[in-house]
C-alpha cells in the first residue's frame, strides 16, 4: 500500500511539475527564513548541554526527557534511540509521549514572527508542554510493564559534534517539510474544492510549519483557531512523526504507536489550551 501511494505521488509530481516546484519553493522559504534561524542555534545549545550532562553520567531517562522538552523533536527521539537499552517498555512509551514535542522556539519565535500575539504564543507553549506531561502520566500509568528494551544502538552515536549533528538534524527537518508540503499540494490538486481553511488543516496534519503559517494567513485570531492550533501542534504532523520514527524504530517503537501517542498529546494540548483561554 505504501509503495502504491509513493508511485501515485511520483506520478502527480511528474504530471504537475509547476505545483511541485511552487510548493517546494514555499516550503524551503519557510524552512530557511523562519525555521533555521530559530531552531538551529537552539538545537546546538541543547546538544552541547546533553553532551555535558552525559559526560557526568546523568541518568538516561531524565536526560532524554530534559533534551526532548528543551529541543523538541527529533532531539528527544535521537536521545532515546541511544539510551533506551534496559528501560521498561512502559517507561520508553511514556518518554516517547513526553518528548515527541515541538521546539519551544517554534512557539515564542516562529509563530510570533508570523503574527500570532505573544500572549497566545505563551499559552500555546504552556498547553503544548502540559499536554505532553499529561500524556506522559497517562501512558506511564496505563501501559503494562512488559519486557525491557534491548540495547540496539551504541552510545557513541550520541557523542558526535554538536554543530555537525545539528546541521544534519535541521537538514532532515527541511527534507520532511518539503516532502509533506509537496504531498499537501498534490492533494489540493486532486480536491480543488477544499476551502483555504481546510487546506491549512490538511497541511498541518501532514507538515506542521507550513500548515500553521497557512492557517494564520487564512483565519483571524479566535478561540476556535487558537484551540485548533494547540491540537495540531500537539499532534505535530506526520512530518515530525516520521522524523521521530527514523530514530525510534531501532527501539521497537512502531509508527502506529507514535501515532496513538501523538493523538493523545493533541487531545491533552487542546483541552489545556481551552482551559487557559477560558481562565484568562
PLM regions and their residue ranges:
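Selected transmembrane alpha-helices and immediately adjacent juxtamembrane segments
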Residues: 4-40, 44, 122-194, 271
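Small-residue-rich segments of transmembrane alpha-helices in multi-pass membrane proteins
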Residues: 7-8, 34-40, 100-104, 155, ...
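Pore-lining and gate-forming transmembrane alpha-helices of multi-pass membrane transport proteins
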Residues: 26, 30, 123-124, 199-204, ...
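Juxtamembrane transmembrane-helix boundary signature
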Residues: 39-59
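Alpha-helical membrane segments and immediately flanking helix-loop junctions
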Residues: 58-115, 202-218, 225-249
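Membrane-core helix-loop-helix motifs of multi-pass transport proteins
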Residues: 86-140, 248-271
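Transmembrane helical segments that form the transport core of multi-pass membrane transport proteins
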Residues: 163-233
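Juxtamembrane boundary at the C-terminal end of a transmembrane helix
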Residues: 272-280
Amino acid at each position: 500500500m505504501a509503495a502504491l501511494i509513493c508511485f501515485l505521488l511520483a506520478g502527480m509530481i511528474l504530471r504537475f511539475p509547476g505545483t511541485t516546484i511552487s510548493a517546494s519553493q514555499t516550503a524551503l522559504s519557510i524552512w530557511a527564513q523562519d525555521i533555521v534561524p530559530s531552531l538551529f542555534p537552539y538545537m546546538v545549545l541543547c546538544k552541547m548541554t546533553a553532551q555535558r550532562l552525559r559526560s557526568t553520567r546523568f541518568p538516561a531517562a531524565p536526560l532524554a526527557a530534559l533534551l526532548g522538552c528543551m529541543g523538541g523533536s527529533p532531539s528527544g527521539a535521537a536521545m532515546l534511540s541511544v539510551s533506551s537499552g534496559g528501560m521498561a517498555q512502559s517507561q520508553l512509551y511514556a518518554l516517547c509521549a513526553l518528548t515527541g514535542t515541538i521546539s519551544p522556539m517554534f512557539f515564542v519565535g516562529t509563530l510570533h514572527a508570523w503574527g500570532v500575539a505573544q500572549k497566545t504564543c505563551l499559552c500555546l507553549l504552556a498547553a503544548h508542554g502540559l499536554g505532553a506531561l499529561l500524556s506522559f502520566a497517562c501512558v506511564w500509568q496505563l501501559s503494562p510493564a512488559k519486557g525491557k528494551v534491548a540495547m540496539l544502538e551504541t552510545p557513541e552515536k550520541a557523542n558526535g559534534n554538536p554543530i555537525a549533528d545539528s546541521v544534519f538534524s535541521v537538514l532532515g527537518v527541511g527534507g520532511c517539510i518539503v516532502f509533506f508540503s509537496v504531498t499537501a499540494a498534490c492533494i489540493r490538486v486532486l480536491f480543488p474544492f477544499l476551502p483555504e481553511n481546510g487546506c491549512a488543516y490538511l497541511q498541518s496534519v501532514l507538515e506542521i510549519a507550513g500548515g500553521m503559517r497557512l492557517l494564520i494567513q487564512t483565519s483571524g485570531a479566535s478561540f476556535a483557531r487558537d484551540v485548533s492550533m494547540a491540537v495540531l501542534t500537539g499532534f505535530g504532523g506526520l512530518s515530525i512523526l516520521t522524523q521521530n520514527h527514523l530514530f525510534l524504530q531501532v527501539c521497537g517503537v512502531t509508527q502506529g504507536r507514535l501515532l496513538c501517542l501523538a493523538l493523545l498529546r493533541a487531545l491533552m494540548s487542546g483541552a489545556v489550551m481551552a482551559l487557559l483561554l477560558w481562565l484568562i
